[in-house]
Regions:
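Transmembrane core module of solute transporters
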Residues: 1-153, 259-260
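Perimembrane helix-loop junctions in membrane proteins
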Residues: 12-13, 58, 181-185, 251, ...
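Hydrophobic alpha-helical segments of secondary membrane carriers
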Residues: 33, 157-161
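Hydrophobic transmembrane architecture of multi-pass small-molecule transporters
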Residues: 139, 161-253
């Protein structure tokens, strides 16, 4: 089916999806860079509030207060980026953006279940800088050199790839988060249940406070879950940071025309 689709679209005079756009280096490299970067960005935007609400004790409102700050610097800096886009190589803007995203994700990879609100907030604010230098320059690179009559088709294909990558990125990230958390949970349980004095003392202390044995075990399991899902989130943050860095050479494959 897919082979038939390719053959049809490549030979049709008026194709629904103009695959010949991918003959242009700027378009295919820019579209792929945009799709992967957006998938990483959106996956982490979804993962953060899930972790905060489920394992850090944040309410939906409080986690929303953390994530909403990402727009502050983006709103301020986006007009500056747009104004200077014709003067500066957009690849430099995108490179700076990916470095900022990598820094933000590295900062998040230092989180623990004891991390306070302000420490969690700082990377989110900084992420706004990356957003300002991300979307506008990448669109400029992707559409650079496209003939005016093909601009609508090129924009549509690029946006479709970006939105699809966002959906895939979210699904992959949340699935990996849960799978890796299960792995960490198993290994943490082995440590907790290995007959250590600390575990026995903790159970005794909780039972002295009036908790039954099942309640004490359930509470310890909850603590193990918190650590397991936090470790899993940290792994995803690290991996995402490395992927943003890996995308930087990919951006420099393109040869955008100055000013778009």
């Amino acid at each position: 089916g897919f082979a038939f689709f390719l053959a049809w679209e490549l030979t049709e005079d008026h194709p629904v999806v103009d695959l010949s756009l991918f003959k242009g280096r700027n378009f295919w490299a820019g579209s792929i860079a945009t799709a992967i970067a957006y998938g990483l960005f959106f996956a982490n935007v979804v993962l953060m509030p899930l972790w905060l609400q489920q394992y850090m004790g944040y309410t939906a409102t409080r986690s929303g207060m953390v994530m909403a700050q990402v727009g502050l610097l983006a709103i301020v800096l986006s007009p500056v980026v747009g104004k200077n886009l014709a003067k500066v190589d957009p690849r430099k803007f995108v490179t700076f953006s990916f470095l900022v995203f990598a820094l933000v994700l590295w900062m998040r990879a230092q989180f623990s279940t004891q991390t306070d609100f302000d420490t969690i907030l700082i990377p989110t604010v900084i992420q706004g800088i990356g957003m300002a230098f991300f979307f506008i320059p990448l669109v400029s690179i992707t559409l650079s050199g496209i003939e005016p009559h093909r601009m609508a088709a090129a924009s549509g294909v690029s946006n479709f790839m970006r939105i699809t990558a966002g959906a895939f990125g979210t699904s992959i990230a949340t699935t990996l988060w849960e799978d890796r958390a299960k792995w960490h949970h198993v290994h943490l349980v082995e440590v907790v249940s290995s007959g250590r004095t600390v575990t026995a003392d903790a159970l005794t202390g909780m039972q002295n406070l009036g908790l039954t044995s099942p309640q004490s075990l359930a509470l310890i399991n909850r603590w193990v879950d918190e650590q397991a899902f936090t470790l899993s989130a940290i792994e995803i943050f690290y991996a995402s940071a490395l992927m943003f860095l890996a995308l930087i050479p990919f951006v420099w494959i393109t040869r955008p025309r100055r000013g778009g």
